[in-house]
Structure formats: structure tokens, C-alpha cells
Amino acid sequence: MPFIVKIKKQLALYELTVDLETEAGILAVIGGSGSGKSMTLKCIAGIETPDSGFISLNGRVLYDSSKKINLPPQKRNVGYLFQEYALFPTMTAAENISIVMKQKNPVQVQKWLEEYGLGDYADSYPDHLSGGQKQRLAMIRMLAAEPQCILLDEPFSALDEHIKRKMEREVMEMLHDFDKPILFVSHNQEEVYRLADRIGSMENGRFSPIREKRAFFAEPQTVGQAKLVGCNNISEIDWISEDRVYAKDWNLSLRVPFTE
């Protein structure tokens, strides 16, 4: 069943307006800093409350302003990977995982730790782990809770460049068999192109219609989208004939060929 988010929330600079529907696979939400990406995830997770709207996951209503339904985060069954990982600092790696499990299983916890290269760190605290190890632990903990969808909030932004690609591959391997919706927030167009199946953009709190990623990059629909995919040479134009335009910012006349 689809994952549906139709919400509005008044923020200081704009009104957040999100209307999306997605199913299994990775949907990227790309946008600049302050565009509303992270706030959208927080509303879905129940950390923030929209002013109005509706959120349902797998046929289960998480939020409905008209019916005064607003499930707390722990009852939404949504996995959320924060930029800062949000590990419990006074718990060991093994304890960070077992605390979210519906049925405690120390053998399974150790199996996960070993599978993802943390077998020797079961009794270590987060402060004693590297950035990459913390991210792996946060991913294991998130999956151990058996979520019905996953929210990834700039998951690689805190990592050094030389390990970022390695962690991308590791995260994708960990999510390979997760056949439920994944919302992946990023401002990095290369990251989005490598990892996502479909893309929607955020501009001043407004979420654009979802498109297949190749179409999104090949034919951006707004100036904002064009900048997000790396197009920097943008100019206002005036049509001067059927097949010619005048680019105001470049002081150039250009031919625009038409194709049937």
C-alpha cells in the first residue's frame, strides 16, 4: 500500500506544503539549506506536528488533523537516521540495538554487529567509535526496530569525503532487501543521482511532483531545479522569432531548434 503525506505547516519564512505518494524504493528529496527537507521528515516521524493534513503508512493513519489523530514517534514504526546518528551515549553498541527490538535477542544482535564489521565493538560506547562505525551502528539499530519505512536525513554529510562513497555502498547493501518506502534527503545532486530511484525537490517549503531521476536531471521544470542538478548558466530570454531567443544575461542571440 502507498505511503501518503499531505501536510501543511507554517514556518517563519514560508508555509511548508508537501503532497507526495510513494511506495517501495528510494525517493530522494533534494533541496537547498532551509528549504524544508528535514522539517518534512520530522513531521513524518512525529517529532514535529503539522498544522493540518494527513499521513498514512501501509494503510495505517499516523496523522490526520481532521480526526485529531497524531501518533507519537514510538508508535509510528518509522525508521529515522539522523545526521548526528542519535545513538545513546551511555549504552554500549549492543545495548543501542537491543533497546529497540520487539523481542530481545542477544545472539541476533551479535550476528548483526559481526555482519557489519562491528563484532569486536559490542561492549564499546559510541564515543569510542569512528564516524563510519557510528553510522553502521545507527543503521543496524534502525533496521532492528523493523520499520515500515525509512527516513534518511543527509546521512553522509557528517563523513569525511574519502569515506563517504564507501559508506554509501555499505548503506545501500544494508538496505538492499528493504522492500518498503525510503525517503532520502540530500542537497548533493551526485549523491541523489547515484542512490535514488525517483526524485522530488523542495523550494521554499514546497514539494514538487515526483519524477523519475533521469527525467528530473535531463529536463528540470523550474530554475530552482535546474540549479539543484548543477545547471549554472541560466538566463532570462525574450523570443525574437519562431526559432531565436535573446538571452538577456549573456547579451546573446541564440537559435532554438524545434523537434517534432
Regions found by a protein language model. Give the residues of each.
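Helix-to-loop junction immediately C-terminal to a conserved catalytic motif
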Residues: 45
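Short beta-strand immediately N-terminal to the Walker A/P-loop
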Residues: 27-29
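Conserved ABC transporter NBD signature motif
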Residues: 53-65
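Walker A (P-loop) phosphate-binding loop of ABC-type ATPase nucleotide-binding domains
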Residues: 32-36
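ABC ATPase NBD coupling module
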Residues: 62-79, 220
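ABC ATPase nucleotide-binding domains
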Residues: 83, 92-224
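ATPase nucleotide-binding modules
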Residues: 221-260
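ABC ATPase nucleotide-binding domain helices that frame the ATP-binding cleft
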Residues: 38-41, 137
